[in-house]
Amino acid sequence: VGTSEKIVLQGVDEIASLIKHLFTAGVDDLVGRTFDMEAAYRQLAILPSERPKAVICVFDPVLNKVRGFTMATMPFGAISSVYSFLRTAAAINNVGCSLLGLPMSSYFDDFTVVTRSEFSKSANLAVTTSFDVLGLNLSTSERKNIDFAKVFNALGVSFDLHKEVGDFFRIRNTDQRICELLGRIDEVLAANKISGKEAKSLRSRLSFASAQIYGRTTASVLKDLGKYEGNKDRVKLNGNTRLLLRIMRGHLESGMARQVSFGKADVVHIFTDGSLEGDADSGLSAGLGAVLVDQHGKCIKAFSYEPTQDDVQVVGGKIHQLEKLP
């Protein structure tokens, strides 16, 4: 598609930013929900004059020949369809935000709205009415048409809008996503083999899930799985991969959910570093330290430490180990 414009998708971080802004502004008792379009691409018609160019060819086993079918709506997954739909979704979102004053975001055919509990009915009416006026259909299935709530799911994660002591709210992976990932890890461990395609898929899904779990455990797992992506056939897992997958499994089950703070506490920055010079023959000289700086760049606290030769040997003489110590 030739275009000079780029459509910016509003994902999990944008929804989190919206919630944080409302909490910071003093808006309490927030609830949220997601509105999902029914068969989204099929709701966008192709211009009648352009339909002769929109033809799908399918082999007919009865007539034993290829037949062409003219499309009346956007074909799902086609590049032009995606771009055109994203423009439509962005326009709908702009109507909700600018004209209706709704705290709203959009991601493909999912529209997330966050509002006060007392305004939830009017917000629901505003969204459904605007879609009716535009001639677009929202999903009415029980699985997707879920009312406003303190805890709601959007884009594969769960937003918990209970205001915690310390002024923060939580974002975690949905139970369904956790169960699915645990099942896939168990399958890989049981088979003790993985193909490049399987490794790439698992790595991608673990990368998304890890963003909602506190800690850096996943980084090592993702790096290790990347080594298998070039393999066409299934290859045997090495011992390190099995260990990392088991650690990741426990991290998914019991890892602390992502916390987003919205309080007015002062911002501080912590800078840490380590150094290592010399060699084993002449002796190693090491150092490490940290600096605590306020939001204006003023140093609040700092420390430095020079490890002994024995200390350096304990960490194996590796600079990356020293850099982690502060």
PLM features per residue range, with description:
Residues 33-37, 266-281:
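Two-metal-ion RNase H-like nuclease active-site motif
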Residues 36, 56, 77, 89, ...:
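Mobile genetic element proteins and their domesticated derivatives, centered on retroelements
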